[in-house]
């Protein structure tokens, strides 16, 4: 597979349903088992902490990216293989995007949705051709998928090949879909890393 590193976007909020945390932990473990590097936002709380723990416990390579203002002991995972501190949140997003060959959004809030939509937007305007997966735990992303269908139907989103978005309720199903995507116009185009 041309995918070597996967960027995971997800929530950092504590106190969410344990099913979300368990799915995030499983996702991290699966990435590690496949020999894939986890690229993520360096957090130790919520789903961020769970996905990192899952990967680390399975012996995976985990790289965290954090903006200076969030580089605090209460927030940042201390056990990461590598930690990169960036000047601001925009640089963090750009670095995470550059490091990754594919993206997965787990459930999350405004930050996760911002990262997800920026990634989809960049694909649509041709800045990258990397696949994006939604882990649809507990149907979390059902309303979002319906919204995207509506936008396609009403002509606000063009149904081209630029955006490759897959979803699955289970981590193993999602990773299988991501790793087996066939790009219509040749897979070599999106794997380029300048």
Regions found by a protein language model. Name each.
Residues 91-126, 133, 184-192:
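Active-site/ligand-binding-proximal alpha/beta "capping" segment
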Residues 123, 127-130, 138-143:
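Glycine-rich phosphate/nucleotide-binding loop
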């Amino acid at each position: 597979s041309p995918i070597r590193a996967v960027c995971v976007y997800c929530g950092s909020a504590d106190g969410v349903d344990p099913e979300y945390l368990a799915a995030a932990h499983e996702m991290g473990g699966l990435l590690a088992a496949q020999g894939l590097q986890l690229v993520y936002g360096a957090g130790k709380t919520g789903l961020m902490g769970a996905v990192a723990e899952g990967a680390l416990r399975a012996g995976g390579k985990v790289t965290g990216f954090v903006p200076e203002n969030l580089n605090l002991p209460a927030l940042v995972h201390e056990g990461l293989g590598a930690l990169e501190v960036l000047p601001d949140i925009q640089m963090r997003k750009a670095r995470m995007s550059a490091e990754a060959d594919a993206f997965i959004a787990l459930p999350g809030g405004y930050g996760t949705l911002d990262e997800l939509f920026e990634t989809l937007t960049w694909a649509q305007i041709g800045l990258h051709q990397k696949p994006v997966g939604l882990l649809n735990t507990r149907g979390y992303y059902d309303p979002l998928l319906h919204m995207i269908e509506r936008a396609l139907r009403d002509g606000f989103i063009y149904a081209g090949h630029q955006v490759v978005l897959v979803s699955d309720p289970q981590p193993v199903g999602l990773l299988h879909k991501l790793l087996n995507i066939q790009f219509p116009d040749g897979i070599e185009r999106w794997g380029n890393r300048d």
